[in-house]
Amino acid sequence: MLDFALGTEWIVDAYGCDPSSLRSCTALDRLFARIVGELGLHPAGQPVWHVFPGQGGITGLLLLTESHLACHTYPESGLVTINLHCCRARPAWPWQERLVEALGAAQVTVRALPRGRS
């Protein structure tokens, strides 16, 4: 049994996003780069993007030495879901502000879950 956290997992949902941004690997790549840079994270490679056909969304994954950063976009609903797991403590990041800037989000919910605590 652990009595301390082994990291934090952020679960982020952003609603009312611009559908064209949610279909853009460029926009999502810039967002990932900003998250990584501002939080001092360390990529273990390049992001991998899967673009769904037609008007579908994008699934993205970036392996980090600290764990991972992932997103799933739903342009038809104006929604992006983001998951960031870090095995070390990180400062709070302005998810609301950054997702409004990057994707035009109207509403952002953020949950920070300590991992490994019993």
Show where each model-derived region lies.
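Polybasic/polar functional segments that serve as interface/processing modules
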Residues: 1-118
